[in-house]
Amino acid sequence: TTDEQQDRGSVVGFYHIGIPPLDMPSDWTTIVRQQMQRILKSEAYRAASSLHVSVSGPSFNVASYLVTALSQDDPKIALHWSPDAPSYEREIPTLQRMYDHCAAHPKDTLFYLHTKGATRKRPPTSWTMAHWRSYMEYYILDHGRLCQHAIQHGGCDICGLDWRDEDFFASYFAGNFFWTSCAHIRRLPPPNVLVPLAKAAERRLGDWSEFWLAMAPDFKASVLHSTSGLFYLEPYMPEDYEDPSGFRNQSMPHCFPAQRSCATTPHSSSCKGFGP
């Protein structure tokens, strides 16, 4: 009903476009074109009241043109630019925008994706990354109702693919495409506090953007699909994950509880990770 929809808030999308330095080989424009075309046809976008497209790096005019032209200037889309964001911040500016949105809209449900692989131009990595992106988009975008149901009706706080539970390091959704609620986001630290850590760890500990979603002390997670595949090395083909029925014969996702005792220091060896 309308009252129930108002009580749940809106569905809002966040899309991070990370543009590498101009002297770095990249096919980011191809990635943006492919992802925007898929977004616009997806269940996730049809459910959304708005989509925030946040661009980090140079060439904002090119990114803006691609998004505007492909969407035919859809008023649902808002464009943002972080021109001076250093490369080590990666997705943090867009996640901060998501965090700020939730401060004003605590009932909203969110989905998030980014230009995974934009800095990996050379084969075979660029080829395997394209397959990885497509796999994540299949669940998070094309069949977005699965995660939307898990968040809005299933009692889950986060929903995604390939949950990685590292005792020493951190827990995260591999690839960092996900759905979540503003109620969960409001329990996390502001992403901007990760900037000094990201700068210090740029070449050692990987991408802090992936770890942020799991920095609440406890939550319930829904994992739609998992594989032990090495996405950087091996292509994950559609026949390995697509459901011929479009998930019409599958029950809705369920959650498992998760807890962490050192949410603000996920690099600490005292972290025990998450588990059912």
Residues of each region from the PLM?
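ER/Golgi luminal nucleotide-sugar-dependent glycosyltransferases, focusing on the catalytic module
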Residues: 1-276
